[in-house]
């Protein structure tokens, strides 16, 4: 996760995440949205046609890292097999949403 100063001068990082396993049909996106809100990160989460869940997350580097850690477990009904994380581009997003 690379960091850069945001508009307010605070360091920000951004990552793109792909979560593989039983992650659709188990409210993964709903709980990811709640976790993002709790952590104060911005971005989005969506289901992909191949059965994975994709997310773009940006904000405080520690909060982004905490979101990625949460993705390794996900909600109670999920069965996460793999979490791929790539450096993303900070888009200056200020909220998180389900797509």
Swiss-Prot record:
Residues 14-99 form the Acylphosphatase-like domain. It catalyses: an acyl phosphate + H2O = a carboxylate + phosphate + H(+). It comes from the Bacteria. Pfam families: Acylphosphatase (PF00708). One of its GO terms (molecular function) is acylphosphatase activity. It is an enzyme of class 3 (hydrolase). The active site is at 29, 47. Belongs to the acylphosphatase family. This is Acylphosphatase. It comes from Nocardioides sp. (strain ATCC BAA-499 / JS614). The gene is acyP.
